[in-house]
Amino acid sequence: MAYKPQFYPGNTLIAENRRKHMNPEVELKKLRDIPDDEIVKILGHRNPGESYKTVHPPLEEMDFEEDPIKDIVEPIQGAKEGVRVRYIQFADSMYNAPAQPYDRARTYMWRFRGIDTGTLSGRQVIEMRELDLEKISKNFLIDTEFFDPATCGIRGATVHGHSLRLDENGLMFDGLQRYIYDEKTGHVLYVKDQVGRPLDEPVDVGEPLPHDYLAKITTIYRKDNIGMREDKEALEVVQIIHEARTKGGFGLEVFKKDLKKRLGEE
């Protein structure tokens, strides 16, 4: 029997937005078109036009011992070419940003191959072969509605600000001020790369999304938008997981009675 993934429980718009992010068959709306070289500048791992640094020869030139995995798993392009691993990291405002750390983790795992990701309270990192990282950074992480220039920050270090109030232009606080609001154009400009090194020229990532639009596409439950208590199914699943994890922490012995009951032994 084929398994059809449900991705996420719930009947609210928030739950549906989470399912859209995770489902690789759903193509998110493209909102901007940042040039490839501009993406490279923000990432800060290499200069535009510079060759990719490698850590091993191309796979086809390597003499592997017998390894069944290499015949089962198709390597991503960067792995084929021996390109090094690099990262991009985002901080998401709790004020209706399109994504948030756990949503990013689940989305990355569903949509991308050859990645590693780490979840923290206010930021989410994704590591990948540099060649492939640049492609997904442009085509999904930045160009689509997964990203908002005001409430999502590309921050490789000093990420604080996700829980602070937005400024008068709707921008999330950034201690390194990697980006600024251009009052003439109404666009957000990155003046530093993701770790805070000044750029020779600003990178325009477009205008902030309207607050009412963010409220419709966000994956964050909020009392002043859609609260989690409004989503009965999602709340039930969370409670089931919480109870199982809590009881499981005391050992499987606590499940013995329940298991016997399910097996019809009592």
UniProtKB/Swiss-Prot annotation:
Pfam families xref list: MCR_gamma
Pathway: One-carbon metabolism; methyl-coenzyme M reduction; methane from methyl-coenzyme M: step 1/1
Cofactor: coenzyme F430
Molecular function terms, GO-annotated: coenzyme-B sulfoethylthiotransferase activity
Keywords: Methanogenesis, Transferase
EC annotation from Swiss-Prot or TrEMBL: 2.8.4.1
InterPro entries for the chain: Me_CoM_Rdtase_Fd-like_fold (IPR009024), Me_CoM_Rdtase_gsu (IPR003178), Me_CoM_Rdtase_gsu_sf (IPR036994)
Coiled coil: none
Cofactor note: Binds 2 coenzyme F430 non-covalently per MCR complex. Coenzyme F430 is a yellow nickel porphinoid. Methyl-coenzyme-M reductase is activated when the enzyme-bound coenzyme F430 is reduced to the Ni(I) oxidation state.
Catalytic activity: coenzyme B + methyl-coenzyme M = methane + coenzyme M-coenzyme B heterodisulfide
Protein family according to the UniProt entry: Belongs to the methyl-coenzyme M reductase gamma subunit family.
Function of the molecule: Component of the methyl-coenzyme M reductase (MCR) I that catalyzes the reductive cleavage of methyl-coenzyme M (CoM-S-CH3 or 2-(methylthio)ethanesulfonate) using coenzyme B (CoB or 7-mercaptoheptanoylthreonine phosphate) as reductant which results in the production of methane and the mixed heterodisulfide of CoB and CoM (CoM-S-S-CoB). This is the final step in methanogenesis.
Name of protein: Methyl-coenzyme M reductase II subunit gamma
Organism: Methanocaldococcus jannaschii (strain ATCC 43067 / DSM 2661 / JAL-1 / JCM 10045 / NBRC 100440) (Methanococcus jannaschii)
Gene name linked to the record: mrtG
